[in-house]
Amino acid sequence: MQLVLAAKYIGAAIATIGLIGADDKTSNM
């Protein structure tokens, strides 16, 4: 249960960070 919530939360956070800091952090991967 917690894994699903954590995965969803982390996924949203990564998506937001990716959208916001796309230019700043190109070498995220």
Swiss-Prot record:
Keywords: CF(0), Hydrogen ion transport, Ion transport, Lipid-binding, Membrane, Mitochondrion, Transmembrane, Transport. GO terms for molecular function: lipid binding. It comes from the Eukaryota. It is found in: Mitochondrion membrane. One of its GO terms (biological process) is proton transmembrane transport. GO terms for cellular component: mitochondrial membrane; proton-transporting ATP synthase complex. Mitochondrial membrane ATP synthase (F(1)F(0) ATP synthase or Complex V) produces ATP from ADP in the presence of a proton gradient across the membrane which is generated by electron transport complexes of the respiratory chain. F-type ATPases consist of two structural domains, F(1) - containing the extramembraneous catalytic core and F(0) - containing the membrane proton channel, linked together by a central stalk and a peripheral stalk. During catalysis, ATP synthesis in the catalytic domain of F(1) is coupled via a rotary mechanism of the central stalk subunits to proton translocation. F-type ATPases have 2 components, CF(1) - the catalytic core - and CF(0) - the membrane proton channel. CF(1) has five subunits: alpha(3), beta(3), gamma(1), delta(1), epsilon(1). CF(0) has three main subunits: a, b and c. Belongs to the ATPase C chain family. This is ATP synthase subunit 9, mitochondrial. It comes from Wickerhamomyces pijperi (Yeast). The gene is ATP9.
